[in-house]
Design a protein with these regions (language model features):
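Short, flexible, surface-exposed loop segments at domain boundaries
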Residues: 1-169
């Protein structure tokens, strides 16, 4: 991973489901382009690997170089010379996506020259149309601690006492 070799046999693997944030899975669940969180033990060996998408929700605002998910811009790329290539699961390519299609987006957070955040997609997976899970990643803006709200991209999030924000802090 990023130039460091790790044994894939030692850690326990987890992935989100439509019922749980993290459910145990096998190492074969890791796909090319997936974003991973790797937790190391005291000896520097992986003990836990979490397959961790950046966004989950329907596609909106399809354009030539991307789309939005939950108000967060997603950029796609097919040219290895200009950055990470976007891979697709359950889709043939960029043109097979449609507004309203449920997707899971893996990638890296970036900022444009004008300071707007986006996800540079490394993998996009089509999800079932009835997917109940929403996942949102980005920079928090318009934080209002008094009423428990904040904004990521164009999405306003209203928290409650039972809201879990990870990572905490």
């Amino acid at each position: 991973l990023d130039g460091t070799a790790y044994s894939s046999a030692s850690p326990v693997y987890y992935a989100g489901t439509d019922q749980d944030e993290e459910a145990q899975t096998s190492s074969t669940a890791v796909n090319l382009g997936d974003q991973l969180q790797i937790r190391l033990d005291a000896q520097g060996h992986p003990s836990k690997v979490v397959i961790d998408p950046e966004l989950m929700w329907p596609v909106a605002n399809l354009g030539a170089g991307g789309f939005t998910v939950n108000g967060v811009a997603v950029r796609v790329n097919s040219n290895a010379a200009t950055g990470p290539v976007t891979y697709y699961t359950g889709l043939n390519d960029f043109s097979s996506r449609q507004d309203g299609m449920q997707v899971e987006v893996h990638g890296a957070y970036g900022q444009s020259a004008d300071g707007k955040g986006y996800i540079q997609a490394t993998r996009i997976e089509q999800l079932p149309a009835s997917n109940p899970v929403t996942r949102l990643t980005g920079v928090v803006s318009n934080l209002n601690a008094a009423n428990g709200s904040f904004q990521i991209g164009a999405t306003v999030v209203q928290t409650q006492a039972s809201t879990l924000i990870t990572p905490s802090g």
